[in-house]
Design a protein with these regions (language model features):
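Divalent metal-coordination and catalytic microenvironments
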Residues: 81, 167, 195, 239, ...
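Conserved small/polar residues in nucleotide/adenosyl-binding loops
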Residues: 580-587
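Membrane-interface amphipathic/re-entrant loop segments adjacent to transmembrane helices
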Residues: 119-138, 185, 340-356, 366-423
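Hydrophobic alpha-helical transmembrane segments in integral membrane proteins
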Residues: 2-19, 438-444, 451-477
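Hydrophobic alpha-helical transmembrane segments in multi-pass membrane proteins
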Residues: 110, 171, 175-351, 412-463
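Core dinuclear metal-dependent hydrolase active-site scaffold
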Residues: 283-286, 403-417, 421-423, 432, ...
Length: 592
């Protein structure tokens, strides 16, 4: 634990604001967007040739051009720029991008314009002395790029290619935002993130073709070693995501336990996996994927064994259906509080959706060897590509249909304390104290009553209150005046497409806090609550502010402290109105 805190604090180094020349190596496949190309990189030297600590990872953002689009994993670059510490925009309920980069060990970011960088050489062009971990990671990602090229050569394209790459290799950069929202809305985002479920399909294949034929002791040892190598090779190929590393560690411990006649699939092996992972990379402690993976596995290990002796488990088909539902329910039960707290949404249909698409996901993963063999040999490429595309279409169509069901997406506003309370109740419920049926029922009824009371208190504390929100949006300056969840006003300088530009705030803040969309005001406006004239806004509860967008207020000296509480200087303003507000500087707050 203390190593995690130390590693987190170690990322808070201060970068110099001066422009310098740096050498860096790209650590992942560059992500191409409409205007920029982004990539994770590791610094290897400064402008004076001095060595830079190898944990000095950066996020590089290139201005998009034909040269930037050719960048690959392992390329070594020299660039000039100002490295700054990642910061969020400060908008309410926004995605914590700074924390996301910090969890990946990235302590700085830099924008690199055209002709401000030069590629020295690629990964294969020169022998370099990198650490073993970095070298293996780059090689694994290069192999993954080659496999993706094989996928493309078979004729896979579009949404089918993006889904197949995500399910088999963990490459999610090609997935559209619409498809990601569908998987997240139905509660099956774990299907797109490589985890124990995907590795479980691979393990089932290994058991069928390798371990079932290893009867003698030395053959079992050889088979276990071969299976472990294949599992870890696949994990490295996928980029070592925390959820997949956890599954690979537990499977390795399970194989080791089977050789000595002991079960390696237990809470003890789960705890050992967590300790080993945090020793390797303490920053995984803050990764939400790491947290959800271990919570889901803890729920499966503690809840599922209690239902193995039920009478209905005697029939094979019923047992398969019941066990699949039980595993999904146990995993969802222990992850819902954290998902609701971190993401503000959860789905009632997550367990059912997982049960429906699991067979399709299994067929897609089992199709990976076939599509590779077809792409390499050139035999049956059309048939394989058509079959993979058809399976992917069926899976996506099933989830799109579920997305239309009532209460498919439930928006929540859980506080940290309510989330902790939910986990306290769950942990006590699975303790030996509640093993007997009577105690479990008694504690269950009591915990339901107390949880409902805690939920009511949570809603009271999280209820929206009158406030003014100044959104940090460079292309759409906006001020949100909120009176209640039913009544609010959005003042903006943009005449067109205000809702489209504010869509990410709408999804994260408005749908979570407001029961009705705000009234968009782009000009003069007046009603019983608020009025606006040339950017000067005044309303009930003493609300008053001025949005400076042009020079219409220049030369006016009547801006006394009693008239305006906030002065919002919008981007592009070049007037002289600020010269006449010095007498109100004690009470007026300036926002730019």
């Amino acid at each position: 634990m203390w190593r995690s805190f130390y590693a987190w604090e170690n990322l808070r180094g201060v970068w110099t604001d001066e422009e310098r020349e740096y050498h860096a190596i790209l650590l992942n496949t560059p992500q191409i967007s409409s205007r920029t190309v982004g990539a994770e990189a590791m610094l290897v030297a400064g402008d004076d040739g001095s060595s830079v600590r190898q944990t000095g990872k950066l996020w590089l953002t290139f201005s998009r051009d034909s040269l930037a689009e050719t960048l690959r994993t392992g390329d070594e670059l020299v660039f000039k720029g100002r490295i700054r510490r990642p910061k969020n925009k400060g908008n309410p309920e926004e995605f914590d991008y700074a924390e996301y980069l910090a969890v990946k060990g990235i302590s700085g970011r830099v924008f690199i314009g055209k002709e401000r960088w030069k590629r020295i050489h690629g990964y294969e062009d020169k022998e370099r002395h990198l650490s073993l971990g970095v070298d293996l990671r780059i090689k694994a990602l290069l192999w993954r790029d080659r496999i993706l090229e094989v996928y493309r050569n078979t004729g896979l394209q579009g949404e089918a290619l993006d889904l197949f790459a995500a399910l088999t290799l963990g490459e999610k950069s090609g997935l559209s935002d619409e498809l990601k929202d569908i998987y997240a809305g139905v509660g099956v985002s774990h299907v797109l993130a490589l985890s124990g479920m995907h590795l479980g399909f691979l393990v089932a294949m290994l058991n069928l073709f390798i371990l079932n034929y290893c009867r003698r002791r030395y053959l079992r040892l050889l088979g276990a070693v071969l299976a472990t190598v294949l599992v870890w090779g696949y994990t490295f190929l996928a980029g070592l995501p925390p959820s997949l590393v956890r599954a690979a560690l537990m499977y390795s411990l399970m194989l080791a336990g089977s050789l000595v006649g002991r079960s390696g699939f237990s809470v003890n092996s789960l705890a050992m996996s967590a300790v080993l992972m945090l020793c390797i990379n303490p920053l995984w402690f803050y990764d939400v994927g790491f947290q959800l993976s271990f919570l889901a596995m803890f729920g499966i290990l503690t809840i599922c064994p209690r239902f193995q002796e039920l009478p209905l488990m005697r029939w094979r088909f019923v047992r398969w259906i019941f066990q699949s539902l039980l595993v999904s329910f146990a995993a969802q039960l222990f992850t819902v509080p954290l998902v609701a707290y971190r993401f503000g949404t959860f789905s009632f249909y997550s367990a059912w959706a997982t049960l429906v698409i699991s067979p399709l996901t299994a067929l897609l993963i089992y199709g990976m060897p076939l599509i590779l063999l077809s792409g390499i040999t050139g035999i049956g490429t059309t048939v394989c590509a058509w079959w993979i595309a058809r399976l992917g279409t069926w899976q996506n169509d099933c989830l799109r249909a579920m997305m239309e069901w009532p209460y498919a997406v439930v928006h929540t506003d859980w506080s940290l304390w309510f989330t902790i309370w939910c986990y306290v109740v769950l942990c006590v419920w699975v303790m030996p104290f509640c093993r007997s049926y009577t105690r479990r029922v008694q504690f269950g009824l009591m915990s339901v009553i107390l949880t409902l009371c805690a939920f009511a208190v949570n809603r009271q504390f999280c209820r929206i209150r009158p406030e003014i929100v100044f959104y940090n949006h460079s292309s759409c300056p906006s001020v949100h005046v909120i009176y209640s969840s039913e009544r609010s006003y959005l003042f903006s300088t943009e005449e067109d497409s205000v809702r489209e530009r504010m869509s990410y705030i709408s999804e994260s803040f408005w749908e979570k806090k407001l029961s009705d969309v705000p009234v968009v005001v782009t000009g003069d406006f007046r009603d019983n609550y608020i009025s606006s004239v040339h950017g000067l806004v005044a309303g009930r509860n003493g609300i008053s502010f001025l949005m400076l967008t042009d020079n219409r207020w220049d030369g006016i000296r009547g801006m006394h402290r009693a008239e305006v509480d906030f002065l919002y200087v919008c981007r592009g303003y070049h007037g002289s109105c600020l010269l006449y507000t010095s007498d109100a500087a004690d009470d007026m707050q300036c926002v730019d």
